[in-house]
Each structure stands twice: as C-alpha cells, then as structure tokens.
C-alpha cells in the first residue's frame, strides 16, 4: 500500500509543467523584490477616470524620447490589429516560456501579443493582467530603425526610448514584455491574471548613432508639375551720364550673385547633424519646361536642404544722348517648383550596420532665371551746361 501511494505521488509531481515551475519562480521573485507596499510605501497609484477612458482611443504617433521631439517620419509606427501579424512587427524571443512575443499596445498600455494565446494584447493594468482584442502592434517598416534593449532601474529611461504614450514606455524583463511607468519608477509585467512590478528592466531603444546617410535611386514624377514664375525683379541697377554735346557709347557691366535653394524632403526622418549625400539628377526649372540633368552627387551638411550661390555678369553697350542720364538694370525672375519623387534612404551606423528603406518625398527648388539687362528711358541732366 505504501508503495502504491509513493508511485501516485511521483506521477503527480511529474505532471508539474515547466510553466508552473516558472510561475513559482516569478511568484518567489515577486515576493522577494516586488511587493507594492514594501517598495512604494503604499499601493500603486490608481488611474483617473480620464486616463481610463483613453484606453479605447487612438494615441499619438510613436515618439522617441530625446532632446527634440521624434517626428512622425519615423519608420516605427503603431499598426491597428486586423487579424494578421503585419510585416516587420517588432518581437522578442521569449526564451522563458519558449515562444515569440510581439510588442503591442491597448490605448497607452504596452504589453505583448502571442499567437499561442489568441488574437489579444495582454497588458498590466490596475494590479491585474488584462487583455483586449482591439489593439495596435509596433511595426518597424523595412526594419529600418536599429532597435536595442537597454538595461535600466528605478524608472530611468534611456535617451531614445520608445514611448507608448505619456510616461509609459515599451519595456521587458526576463519573463516577458510589459510597460515601464516612469512616474511610478517601476516596470510592470502581466503574468497569468496578475500585474507584477520590478525595479530592474530593459527599455526598447532606438539607435541614433548614424555616421552616414544617402539618398539614391531618385525618380522624379513630372506628371502635373507646375513651375511658378514670379514677376521680373531688379537684381542690380546703375546709371550712366553723358555731359557731352554729342551721343556717347559706353560699355556697362552688371554683376550680381543669386541663391538657388533645393531640398529633398523625404517621408522618413533624416538624422540631424549627419551629412547627407544625394545621388540624383538635378531639375532645372528656370524655363517653360523642366529638364533634369545627368545624375550627380550633392553633399548636404544639414537636413535635406542645400543653398548655392550663382554669379551673373552682363555687359551692355549703351548709347547715351547729349546731356542725359540713362538707367540700366539687371532683372530676373524667380522660379519655384515642387516635384514628387521616390528613392531609397540608406544609413550607416558607427557599429558598421547598414539599413535602408524606400522613401517618397518632394523635391523643392527656388531658382532665379531669365536674367537680362534693361536700358530704361534717359532723362536730361538738370544742371548740365547747355551746348
């Protein structure tokens, strides 16, 4: 009889799954290091009604916390769940439970989605693990951004941390994905119906250490492009006087420098402080039609705009009547055009990694053209000696 009881006991023990063992480890870790009252001195703050109501609303385009606001041009975006995992969805290999978990968000609350648990995003909220079938998944289009997990403690946030919104950030620990609540100074983990908190965690971070960037394969779409031409304006003027009693012919030279500005504004973010090389043909818009030159390389030191100075020189032979003063001007028209284009943006990082992504953008140019000399009517010189 004792032998039979022993065998039954061994069978029961053998039925304990690895995940149950994992639950025990998490509970032990939670009890040792993550008691809400012992670490915070009181229960974790409750959400207000206003905050709770935001769970079902759209939240701002993803931003990266840094000295300046990360623009909506980032390849990172929150994509609404439509029943299928989007291409280039951000995921982790959760070795603790042996599955792939995807970064998701319900309202402002970051959590995880895994196909093994059905079409829901699981997230920590109000001391419990909650889930919703209405959620967004984080996507890194073309895997263009280099994403890294940076270890932090006590609510610390790295410079380029990925925000869910407000002071909530995408984070994880060895057990899985959750959220870093910066004002609470802790990381929250959803686990089997309960919300656990931890002082140590990893925050999802964007590597911004770009050393080179290039725009190549530029193709302009000339369909429907209109060139705007301003009225002629005076660039330079001079006057020529003839005090003689007969006509005089004089050679006049007019010189002036004008600025031509051009930019390739793309749908992706350009890393500031890093020069950009653009390999493309250059549209010439100072005419009725737009002509594109052969491909050349343009080095841009800041952003995607470049301004160049062009010198103009005109020589005019003017016949001046006796005792007269004639005005001669250099005139030109300002041309402006916006031309859609497609291309490819490539980045090189200090660690040697290279990423690239397709881009759409607008080529903008302001150029002065149709420069000519104009001889205006001559006037008699009032104080000239009579002939």
From Swiss-Prot:
Q: What are its GO cellular component terms?
A: extracellular region
Q: Which top EC class is named for this enzyme in its record?
A: hydrolase
Q: Give the UniProt subcellular location, in the record's own words.
A: Secreted
Q: Its domain of life?
A: Eukaryota
Composition bias of kind Basic and acidic residues appears in: 31-40
Q: Which GO terms describe its molecular function?
A: hydrolase activity; toxin activity
Q: Which Pfam families match?
A: DM9
Span of the secretion signal?
1-18
Q: Which InterPro entries does the record match to this protein?
A: DM9_repeat (IPR006616)
- Look up keyword GTP-binding and say if it applies: no
Q: Give EC number(s), comma-separated.
A: 3.4.-.-
Where this protein primarily resides, as one coarse class? secreted
Q: Which residues form the propeptide?
A: 19-46
For the region Disordered, what residue ranges are annotated? Answer: 31-57
The organs and tissues expressing this protein are described as: Expressed by the venom gland.
Please report the PTM annotation for this entry.
Contains 4 disulfide bonds.
How's its activity regulated? Inhibited by tissue-kallikrein inhibitor TKI and trasylol. Plasma kallikrein inhibitor PKSI527 and classical inhibitors of serine-, metallo-, thiol- or aspartate-peptidases evokes a minor inhibition of the peptide digestion.
**SMART domains, alphabetized:** DM9 (SM00696)
- Keyword Transmembrane helix attached: no
| Keywords, in A-Z order | Disulfide bond, Hydrolase, Secreted, Signal, Toxin
Q: What does this protein do?
A: Shows nociceptive, edema-inducing and kininogenase activity with release of kallidin from low molecular weight kininogen. The cleavage occurs at Met-Lys bonds.
- What does the similarity note say? Belongs to the natterin family.
| Protein name stated in the entry | Natterin-4
Give the organism, scientific name: Thalassophryne nattereri
């Amino acid at each position: 009889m004792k032998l039979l009881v022993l065998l039954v006991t061994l069978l029961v023990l053998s039925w304990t799954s690895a995940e149950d063992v994992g639950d025990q480890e998490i509970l032990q870790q939670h009890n040792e290091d993550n008691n809400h009252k012992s670490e915070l001195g009181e229960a974790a703050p409750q959400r207000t009604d206003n905050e709770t109501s935001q769970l079902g609303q759209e939240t701002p385009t993803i931003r990266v916390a840094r000295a300046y606001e990360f623009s909506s041009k980032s390849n990172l975006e929150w994509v609404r769940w439509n029943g299928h995992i989007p291409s280039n969805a951000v995921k982790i290999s959760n070795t603790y439970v042996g599955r792939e978990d995807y970064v998701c968000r319900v309202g402002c609350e970051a959590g995880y989605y895994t196909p093994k648990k059905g079409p829901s995003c699981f997230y920590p909220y109000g001391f419990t693990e909650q889930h919703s079938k209405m959620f967004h998944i984080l996507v890194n289009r073309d895997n263009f951004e280099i994403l890294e997990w940076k270890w932090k403690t006590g609510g610390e946030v790295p410079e380029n941390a990925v925000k869910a919104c407000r002071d909530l950030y995408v984070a994880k620990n060895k057990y899985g994905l959750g959220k870093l609540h910066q004002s609470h100074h802790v990381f929250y983990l959803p686990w089997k119906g309960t919300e656990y908190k931890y002082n140590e965690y990893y925050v999802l971070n964007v590597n911004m250490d770009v050393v080179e960037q290039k725009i190549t394969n530029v193709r302009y779409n000339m369909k429907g492009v209109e060139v705007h031409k301003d009225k002629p304006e005076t660039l330079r003027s001079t006057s020529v006087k003839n005090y003689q009693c007969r006509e005089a012919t004089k050679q006049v030279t007019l010189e002036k420098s004008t600025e031509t500005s051009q930019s390739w504004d793309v749908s992706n973010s350009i890393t500031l402080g890093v020069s950009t090389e653009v390999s493309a043909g250059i549209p010439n818009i100072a005419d009725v039609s737009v002509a594109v030159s052969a491909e050349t390389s343009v080095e841009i030191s800041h952003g995607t705009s470049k301004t160049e100075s062009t010198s103009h020189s005109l020589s005019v032979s003017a016949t001046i009547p006796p005792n007269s003063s004639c005005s001669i001007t250099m005139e030109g028209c300002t041309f402006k055009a916006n031309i859609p284009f497609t291309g490819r943006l490539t980045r090189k990082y200090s660690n040697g990694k290279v990423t690239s992504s397709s881009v759409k953008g607008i080529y903008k140019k302001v150029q002065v053209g149709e420069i000519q000399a104009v001889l205006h009517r001559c006037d008699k010189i009032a104080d000239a000696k009579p002939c």
